[in-house]
């Protein structure tokens, strides 16, 4: 269960340090790409911590301000991944991920060259010199950070989470291959953008069959890949979603999240 912010700097981070959420989504998909603000936000989390669970900061996953529509876009903008991870966040999420080559570049941009080799992805692209700030945010040495800052579950000891939004009809065509790239850690299906892509409406609480089929395909792809599926949750459907196997709930809020935790008998450390 996560909380989302669409912008914010030091003060906003400090206020969210004691969040109810399991992690924070810092959404730059439709917001300014401001690394000064993001670094301030992360420092605010440190200064407002530790968390209720005793961690230095909450986990933060940043939504990138690019769409993964093809390889050219990814090669032209992979530097954004390095900048974002260099701010000390713990993961990145890519919108409109259309194809396994896009996923591969995203994973490579999230790793260091000396990270453990793996079939299906090439050498990491993160460079030396950018690890100092992120290491301080994590509270570790530069060397320790470089060992920890690798993609899970490709590296079982990695603490970087890389996610995909399979959220249009073009991305759906290669959903299985995209989420199956080693280093991808979770995926979602993006009902809003998928509705626009198919030019259908979800008004009145009814989901058109084409959307239900899209959701089912992405969900099945994550199951095959052995990674979590993210879906919207509310008070009316949270138990159903949990029973179905949804692992990450969006839009839940504190009360709904607590209800889900109680349903799964999950005891929080506070």
Regions found by a protein language model. Give the residues of each.
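Expand to "…catalyze enediolate/carbanion chemistry for C-C bond making/breaking, isomerization
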Residues: 1-270
């Amino acid at each position: 269960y996560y909380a989302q912010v669409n912008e914010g700097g030091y003060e906003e981070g400090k206020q969210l340090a004691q969040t109810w959420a399991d992690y924070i989504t810092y959404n730059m998909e439709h917001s300014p790409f401001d690394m000064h603000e993001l670094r301030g936000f992360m420092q605010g989390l440190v200064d407002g911590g530790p968390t209720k669970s005793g961690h230095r900061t909450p986990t933060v996953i940043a939504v990138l301000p690019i769409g993964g529509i093809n390889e050219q876009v990814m090669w032209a903008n992979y530097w954004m991944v390095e900048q974002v991870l260099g701010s000390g966040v713990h993961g990145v999420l890519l919108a409109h991920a259309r194809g396994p080559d896009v996923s591969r570049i995203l994973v490579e941009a999230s790793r260091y060259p000396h990270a453990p080799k793996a079939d299906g992805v090439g050498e990491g692209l993160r460079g030396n010199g950018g690890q100092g700030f992120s290491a301080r945010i994590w509270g570790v040495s530069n060397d320790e950070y470089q060992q920890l800052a690798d993609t899970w579950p490709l590296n079982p000891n990695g603490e970087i989470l890389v996610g995909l939004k399979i959220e249009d009809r073009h991305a759906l065509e290669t959903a299985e291959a995209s989420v199956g790239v080693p280093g991808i850690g979770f995926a979602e299906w993006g009902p809003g953008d998928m509705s626009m892509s198919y030019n259908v409406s979800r008004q009145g609480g009814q989901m058109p069959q084409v959307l239900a089929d899209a959701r089912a395909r992405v969900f099945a792809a994550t199951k095959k890949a052995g990674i979590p599926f993210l879906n919207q949750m509310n008070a009316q459907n949270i138990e159903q979603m949990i029973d179905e196997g949804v692992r990450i709930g969006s839009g839940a809020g504190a009360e709904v999240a607590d209800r889900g935790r109680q349903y799964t008998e999950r005891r929080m450390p506070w």
